[in-house]
Structures are given as structure tokens and as C-alpha cells.
Amino acid sequence: MAGRLWGSPGGTPKGNGSSALLNVSQAAPGAGDGVRPRPSWLAATLASILIFTIVVDIVGNLLVVLSVYRNKKLRNAGNVFVVSLAVADLLVAVYPYPLALASIVNNGWSLSSLHCQLSGFLMGLSVIGSVFSITGIAINRYCCICHSLRYGKLYSGTNSLCYVFLIWTLTLVAIVPNLCVGTLQYDPRIYSCTFTQSVSSAYTIAVVVFHFIVPMLVVVFCYLRIWALVLQVRWKVKPDNKPKLKPQDFRNFVTMFVVFVLFAICWAPLNFIGLVVASDPASMAPRIPEWLFVASYYMAYFNSCLNAIIYGLLNQNFRQEYRKIIVSLCTTKMFFVDSSNHVADRIKRKPSPLIANHNLIKVDSV
């Protein structure tokens, strides 16, 4: 018997939504014979996670965007992709997450099916946009470090903006089929309107492969080649001919590598569950514990607030710009002033953006 999809048992959405939205497949992991009553501590925990994620996501990613806008040292071709990633993270914090929080408070979905569709659409747009932006960052780093002679031509200001436009065009194209297949549904286990893995096994496998596994393999390839080149230069080249590896540049590269690793860790469990369920829905779905399904989703949700924190912890330029922005909030007229124009700032700090145009290794290899 299919579990009730809208809200708590017996709950129905307001409005006249498509009947496809009102059903959940028997194969949905954890669906069982209905939605079981949730203990109050679980709802409180999920609500706390969402509140923290929303606040840190909005504040942190706005700081990232404003930092790049205010500081000329951070306005470079590589950081265009960082801003793209920040925008992708902001998408979920301003609409889908607040609606999920409202569902937790109300113990069910209380809005129309249109809000559900829009929430699920923005959720997918954010996820795929994040994946493609992280892939764009990795390719940018690979070209900058391993093919430095051609980097300036490949990543001119105009070209970089075109790449970001391509990223979001592909993201939009990738998410539109969800509206046609009917995979954007409300799931009471996670209090969210999101991609439903059990609607179509073939489509779920295609989504996981092309929207997660393939992009992550591209990122892994890029970073492995970068690490190989860095290690080769550091350990196998004679000291006399060894190019200088600037510590600050290396930390900048590590920052983006950490962003990728955390994204992969947070999203891998959910994608793995999707593949397992899609491989044999009838037998595998009932074996997925509900707590694991819920935990994998909220781990993925939590990732949207991590990137801005990583930049602040690992990158001095962003950390200092964060501090300036927070202080300048008290002086409105100074808020949108280019902070890199201050004489004292130019004296105290050397240029060292998160993704700089100067390279770790001045060789054109790999």
C-alpha cells in the first residue's frame, strides 16, 4: 500500500495539483504503509539543522558575493565560478528550505502543489548548478596550473562569463525533464518537495550518473593531475631548476579541493541510495532504513552552508574581507566602496585571491 505523500497521515495539499503528485511509489524507501508519527525531538532536530543551514547559507554566501564585488583582488576569472557556486547555494536558502521548515512546524505540507513544484524545481536547480559549478572550478584550476601558457586566452573575462552562462543553461536543461516525468513530489519523511527516486528507475539512474558521477569523475581527474604535477615538482625536480611553490597559492588550491571533498561526502550517500533503490525497487527499497534516508537528505542540505565557512577558515583574503564587510555594515556609505582601494590595505596585504591568475607551477605540461 502506498504511503500518503502530502504531510502527515491524512494530510492533503491545498489547491488542485496533478494526481501524480499525490502518490508515492510502493518502492519508496521507508514509505511503508503510511507515515508513522514522529517523535518531537526528531522534528526539533531537523528544524534546528534547517534554521542553522538557512542562516549560515544566506549570510555566508552573501559575504562571498560581496567580497568578490568589493575587492578587485578577488575579481578574477576563476572567482566567477566561486560566485556561481554561491548563487547556487543561495537558491535553496531563500525558498525551498524555509518551506521545508514550515512543513516541520505544521507537521505536513500546507501550501498548494504549485509551491511544491516550484520548491522542488529550485532545489534541483541548486543541486545541479552546484555540481556543474564545482566542475567548472576544477577545470579552471587544471587549466591554470597544468596549462598555464594557454590559461589567459582560455579564461579571459568574456570567456569566463560565457562558461558560467553555459553552466546555468545546462543546469536548466537538466532540470526541466523533472517537470515532465513527474518526479518533483512532496516526501513527508524529509518534509520537502524534492526529486522522488522511485517514480522511474531508469530516470533515477540517468540523473545520478550524468548529474553526479560523471561530473565528479571529471573533478577527480583534474585534481589528480594537479596533485601529480605539484608532487612531481616538489620531489622529483632538482633544487636548482625547481620553480617556487608559493605557500599562499598552494593553500588557495587546497581550499577549493576541500570544497569538492565536502560536497562529495555530503551528497554521495543520497546518490548511492538512489542507485541502490533504482537497481531493484521492489526488493531494495524496503531495506533502506528511514533514518538513513532522512540523514542522507539533511546531510546534503547542510552542505549548502559549508563553502562560505571554508573560504573564511582557509583563505586569508576572504576572511579579511568578511571582517571588513561586517564592520562596514555600521557605516552604510562605506559598504559598497571598493575595499582594495585603501592605501593601508595595499601596504599590509599582497595580492592573493582565492583563485588567482598566477600559477602554482610555471610549466605547460600534463
From Swiss-Prot:
Record topology, Cytoplasmic segments: 67-79, 140-158, 225-256, 312-366
Subcellular localization: Cell membrane
GO MF annotations in UniProt: hormone binding; melatonin receptor activity
UniProt cross-references to Gene3D superfamilies, sorted A to Z: Rhodopsin 7-helix transmembrane proteins (1.20.1070.10)
Extracellular side: 1-45, 101-118, 180-203, 278-290
Location, primary (coarse class): membrane
Keywords attached to this entry: Cell membrane, Disulfide bond, G-protein coupled receptor, Glycoprotein, Membrane, Receptor, Transducer, Transmembrane, Transmembrane helix
Glycan attachment sites: N16, N23
One Gene Ontology biological process: adenylate cyclase-inhibiting G protein-coupled receptor signaling pathway
Any matching Pfam family: 7tm_1
SMART domains named in the record: 7TM_GPCR_Srsx (SM01381)
Gene Ontology cellular component annotations, sorted alphabetically: plasma membrane; receptor complex
Stated role: High affinity receptor for melatonin. Likely to mediate the reproductive and circadian actions of melatonin. The activity of this receptor is mediated by pertussis toxin sensitive G proteins that inhibit adenylate cyclase activity. Possibly involved in sleep induction, by melatonin activation of the potassium channel KCNMA1/BK and the dissociation of G-beta and G-gamma subunits, thereby decreasing synaptic transmission.
Name of the protein described by the UniProt record: Melatonin receptor type 1A
Organism: Ovis aries (Sheep)
Lineage per the UniProt record: Eukaryota, Metazoa, Chordata, Craniata, Vertebrata
